[in-house]
C-alpha cells in the first residue's frame, strides 16, 4: 500500500485520494443510522447498495457485485475466473496489485510492455491467454484507452474474461459499461474511493452479466458472507444517490489537473496526457528520487516508485488548488536555489 503519513501540516498527494469530502448526504446517513441495528448481521447480498448502484448506472440489480473496495472485487475476480494454465495478460506499467494477486493465487501471467509513450498496444492482447485485466485510465500513467480499442480486445478474446478496471474513469476517458450487454465475457470494476471521496469506507463494485455476477457471489460466500458492514452500506447508498455532487467534485479536480499540467510544464516537467486525478511526471534535470526526498522533508508527499520504467517518474495526486500551490512553491524554490 501507499504510505499513509500523519502530520498536521502535510500536503498528501501520494495515494490518489479525493481532496474533497464525501457528499453531504453521507454524513446525514451515518448520523441517522440506528446504533441498535449494529447488533444484527448486515445484508450479505448488499441489496440496498447494489440497487442504488444499478439505478445510477442503468443496469439490472443482478448485474451488480459489491465488495470492500475495488481491490476486494478485483481479487475475487482473479480467484474466481483466472484459473486456466494459460497466462493472464496485463500491462508492465500498471496497478501493482495485479502481479501480487497472480502470485498469491498461483495464476500464470505475462506483462505486456506499454510502448515508449506508455500507451497500451492492443495487438499484444490478441494472443491466446487465460484472461485479461487492465485499468482505464491506466495507473500510474493516467492514459485512457478508447472504447473502440477496448472493444477490439474483447472481440479478439471471446473465450477469455476481460476485466476493465475503471477506478479513475470519472475523471476522463469513456466507460465501457455500455458494452456489458453486448459481451458476456466483460467485467467492469469501479470504486467509491476516488471520485466519490470514500476511500476510508472501502466500497468497490463490478458490473457484468448476471451469470458472472452469480459465480462471483458463490465464490464470495464460500469465504465470508458478511464482507460489508452496515455503516458502509448506509454511506454508500447516500453517496451514489447524489449525482450533482459527484459531477461538481469531479469538475473541480479536472480543472485543477488541467491547470497543474500548464504550471508543471512551465517548470520543465514532462508527463503523459493524464485523464485521471494524478499526473505521472518526470523532469529532465532532476531525478524523481531527489524531488521526492526534497518534498517529503517539507511534508509534501507524492508517490515515488523507484524501480523499472517508473524510476524516473513521480505520481502526483491532484489536490485542492491550495495544496497544489504549496507543491508549486516548493518546486520553484528548489529549482531557483
Which role does the model predict for each range below?
Residues 119-128, 140-162, 166-198, 210-212:
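Active-site pre-lysine segment of PLP-dependent enzymes
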Residues 23, 45, 185-265, 269-272:
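PLP-dependent aminotransferase class I/II
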Residues 148, 294-303, 307-337:
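PLP-dependent enzyme catalytic core of the Aspartate aminotransferase-like
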Residues 37-38, 47-87, 285:
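Phosphate-binding glycine-rich loop
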Residues 253-254, 266-298, 314:
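Conserved PLP-binding catalytic core of the aspartate aminotransferase-like
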Residues 1-40, 119, 128:
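N-terminal "arm"/small-domain region of PLP-dependent enzymes with the aminotransferase-like
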Residues 80-135:
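PLP-dependent aminotransferase-like
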